[in-house]
Regions:
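Transmembrane helix-bundle core of multi-pass membrane transporters
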Residues: 110-172, 272-281, 300, 307-315
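Single transmembrane alpha-helix segments in multi-pass membrane proteins
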Residues: 17-66, 74, 78, 83-100, ...
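Hydrophobic core segments of alpha-helical transmembrane domains in multi-pass membrane transport
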Residues: 1, 32, 57-61, 111-115, ...
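Hydrophobic alpha-helical transmembrane segments
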Residues: 19-22, 51, 55, 71-79, ...
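Helix-loop-helix "hairpin" substructures at the membrane interface of multi-pass membrane proteins
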Residues: 148-226, 249, 253-254
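Transmembrane alpha-helical segments in multi-pass inner-membrane proteins
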Residues: 211, 222-286
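Cytosolic-side transmembrane-helix boundaries in multi-pass membrane proteins
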Residues: 184-198, 269-315
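Short loop segments and helix-boundary regions at transmembrane helix junctions
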Residues: 41-42, 84-138, 172, 232-233, ...
Length: 315
C-alpha cells in the first residue's frame, strides 16, 4: 500500500514549491515555443530550435563568465540566435531545401559546435552567479499566488511577457497579417505585393533569436552553468508545444505550464523519496507530450503552407 512520506507532496508548502518551480521551468519552453510559433505561422518549420538553444546557452554562459555581465551574455545569445536564424532562412527559404531535414541538420550543428566550444574554451563545468529572483511589490505579498507567480527572476517575467506580445504581433498588426497570409497562401500574398521571402526571413529570425534567449534563460537563470547537451531536448518539446497550442500563444503558454508542472512534480517526487521508480518519474513529462499531441485538435489551425517552399507562379 502506498504511503506518502512525512514531507508529503500533498502539503501546501510543497505544492506551492512545485508550482513555483513549474513557473520557472516554463521559461525556456516559452521563449522557444512562442518564437517557433511565429516562424511556423509564416510557413517555415524549424526543427533546429534545440541546436539554437544550445549555442545560445553556451554564448550567454561564456560571455557572462568572462565579462561578469549577465546582460552581455543575454545579448550574445540573441546574436547567436540571429545568425542561426539567418542560416536557417538561407537554407530553407532562399535555397528551398526540405525544412524538416534542414532543421535536423541545424540541430546537429548546434549540438556539435556547442560541445566543441565548451571543451575547448571552458573544459570543465563552472558556474556563474545568475539572475536573482525579484519580488514584485504588492503582488509578491499575495498569499500563495505571490510565491508562485511574482517572486522570480527577470528572464521568467520576460518569457511570460512574450505571450501577449506575440498575440498582439500576429493578430493585431499589419505585419502579423502578412505573416499569417504568407503561412496560409503565399501565392495570394505575393500577388498583393507582399515579399514572401522577406516575411519568412524575418519570422524565422525572430523565432531563432527567441530560441537563443531560451538557451540563455537556462544557463543564466535556471541552472547557472553550461554542460554538453544542456537542453536535453527542450527545443523539440517546444516544437511539440506549438502543435499542442494550435499556433496560439496563450494556448502554447498553457501547454508549457502543464508540461512544466508535470516535470516539476516528478523532480519533487524524487527529492521527497516518493516510492516510484525514478525512470518512470522521468518519463512522465514525455509521455504527457505524446498524449497531448495525439489528442489535441490542433491540425485545423495549421498554416496551409507550413513546410512548403514558395515558388512564384505556383498555386
Amino acid at each position: 500500500m502506498f504511503q506518502a512520506p512525512e514531507t508529503s507532496i500533498f502539503r501546501l508548502p510543497v505544492a506551492i514549491g512545485i508550482l513555483s518551480a513549474a513557473v520557472r521551468m516554463a521559461t525556456p519552453y516559452l521563449f522557444a515555443s512562442v518564437g517557433e510559433a511565429i516562424a511556423q505561422s509564416s510557413g517555415v518549420l524549424n526543427l533546429g530550435v534545440d541546436g539554437v538553444m544550445l549555442l545560445g546557452a553556451f554564448a550567454a554562459f561564456y560571455v557572462a563568465l568572462t565579462t561578469g555581465s549577465l546582460w552581455l551574455g543575454v545579448l550574445a545569445s540573441m546574436f547567436v540566435g540571429l545568425l542561426m536564424g539567418l542560416l536557417m532562412s538561407l537554407i530553407s527559404v532562399t535555397l528551398k531545401a526540405e525544412q524538416g531535414i534542414s532543421g535536423i541538420g541545424l540541430y546537429m550543428f548546434g549540438l556539435g559546435l556547442s560541445s566543441l566550444l565548451f571543451k575547448v574554451m571552458v573544459g570543465t563545468v563552472k558556474t556563474v552567479v545568475g539572475f536573482q529572483p525579484i519580488k514584485i511589490p504588492l503582488l509578491g505579498n499575495i498569499p500563495i499566488l505571490g510565491e508562485i507567480f511574482f517572486q522570480h527572476s527577470i528572464p521568467v517575467y520576460a518569457a511570460f511577457l512574450t505571450v501577449p506580445l506575440a498575440w498582439f504581433l500576429l493578430d493585431k498588426t499589419t505585419w502579423g497579417l502578412k505573416i499569417r497570409a504568407v503561412g496560409h497562401n503565399p501565392a495570394a500574398a505575393d500577388s498583393l505585393g507582399v515579399n514572401v521571402n522577406l516575411v519568412r526571413y524575418v519570422s524565422v529570425t525572430i523565432g531563432s533569436i527567441m530560441a537563443g534567449l531560451g538557451g540563455a534563460s537556462l544557463s543564466l537563470a535556471l541552472v547557472n552553468l553550461f554542460q554538453e547537451n544542456l537542453t536535453a531536448g527542450i527545443g523539440f518539446i517546444a516544437v511539440a508545444l506549438v502543435y499542442f497550442g494550435g499556433w496560439r500563444p496563450a494556448a502554447i503558454m498553457g501547454g508549457a505550464l502543464l508540461f512544466s508542472v508535470v516535470n516539476a512534480f516528478q523532480l519533487w517526487m524524487q527529492v521527497l523519496n516518493v516510492r516510484i521508480p525514478s525512470d518512470l518519474a522521468v518519463m512522465l513529462p514525455y509521455v504527457l507530450t505524446i498524449l497531448v499531441l495525439a489528442l489535441a485538435p490542433q491540425l485545423s489551425r495549421q498554416p496551409v503552407a507550413l513546410n512548403k517552399p514558395f515558388e512564384r507562379g505556383e498555386h
